Amino acid sequence: MKEFWVWVEPFDRKIVSVALEAGANAVVIPEKGRVEEVKKVGRITVIAPDGDLKLGEDVVYVLIKGKEDEERAAKYPPNVKVIVETTDWTVIPLENLIAQREELYAVVKNAQEAEVALQTLEKGVKGVVLKSRDINEIKKVGQIVSEHEEKLELVTIKITKILPLGLGDRVCVDTISLLHRGEGMLVGNSSGGMFLVHAETEENPYVAARPFRVNAGAVHMYIRVPNNRTKYLCELKAGDKVMVYDYKGRGRVTYVGRAKVERRPMLLIEGRYENKKLSCILQNAETIRLTKPDGTPISVSELKEGDEVLGYVEEAGRHFGMKVEETIIEK
C-alpha cells in the first residue's frame, strides 16, 4: 500500500496534528528532540535523528541534481528507505529510480505532484513525502494517497456445486469501517481462487444491516490482506489490516475491530472460471452473500448452479502468505 509522509520543518505541532488527521503514516522531522512532543499529539511514526526510524540510517534523504546523485540513491541497501527530491522531475525522470529500487519515497509540493509520483511506471513510488505547510494541501494529498490502493482484475465465476455441510467454525470479521453495497472481502479454500463475499449491508425483516461486517467463512480459508499477501481467517485479530474490494476490483485497507469465531452450519460452494475450479465454505444462512458482476449481493440461500458471481484468480502459489512461483495442487 502507498504511504504518506509529511515533512515538518520547522517544527509545528499544528502541522503534525493535521498530518495525523489526514491519515499520514509518518512525519519527517530533521530536528532532534521533538519526538516526545509529537507523541503527545497522537501515535504516529516519527522519522528523525532520534525518532522511531532514524533519519540518516533507516531513512536517508538524497537531493537529486544529476546522474551521480541518482546512482547514489539507487545504491543504498534494500532495507533502507530513500527519500528523493529534485527541483524538476521532468529533468531527472522518476522512472529511472522507481525501476531500480522498491523503498523509494518522492518529495512533492502539492497534490498534483503527488498524483504523478504515485502513477509513474504504473506501480509508482512506495510513498510521497509532502513538503507543504498548507493545511488544505495536506488533506488533499492524504485523500489522493488513500485512493491509490490496490486494483485487481476480478473475474466472473459460474457456480457448479452447492453442498450443505455439517457444523463448522466460521469467522465473522467486524471492521472499523462502514462498507458499502458492492464491497466485500476476497476469501477462498485456495489463495489462487477466491470469492468476493459481500459485506452485511442489506437489511431484511429479521436482521438489521451490519455494514461494518463480513461473515467471511470457515476458519481454514484464505483472506486477502495488504501487500499482495494472504492470511488464514483464524489468524485475524483486532488491529490487523485486511483488504476490502468493490465489484470493480478497487481495493482499500481497513482494520479488524473484532474477529468472532462461532460454530455454525456450513455450505460448500464450488465454481469454475475458464478451466480453473474454485471453492469456498461459507455459513449456511440468508445473511451470507456473494457478489454478482453488477455489484448486487446474492444470498447463499438463493444461490443456484449456473449463477455468476465475482472472484479473483491468480496462478502463483503461496508460501507463508507470500506469492511464489511453484506447483501447488489444492482440492
UniProtKB/Swiss-Prot annotation:
Cystine crosslinks: none
Top-rank taxon: Bacteria
Keyword flag Ligase: no
Alphabetically ordered keywords of this record: Amino-acid biosynthesis, Aromatic amino acid biosynthesis, NAD, Oxidoreductase
One example GO MF annotation: NAD binding
Transmembrane intervals: none
Family matches, as InterPro entries: DHQ_synth
Biological process per Gene Ontology, one example term: amino acid biosynthetic process
EC number(s) given by UniProt: 1.4.1.-
Family the UniProt entry places it in: Belongs to the archaeal-type DHQ synthase family.
PANTHER family: 3-DEHYDROQUINATE SYNTHASE (PTHR33563:SF1), PTHR33563
Name the UniProt record assigns to this protein: 3-dehydroquinate synthase homolog
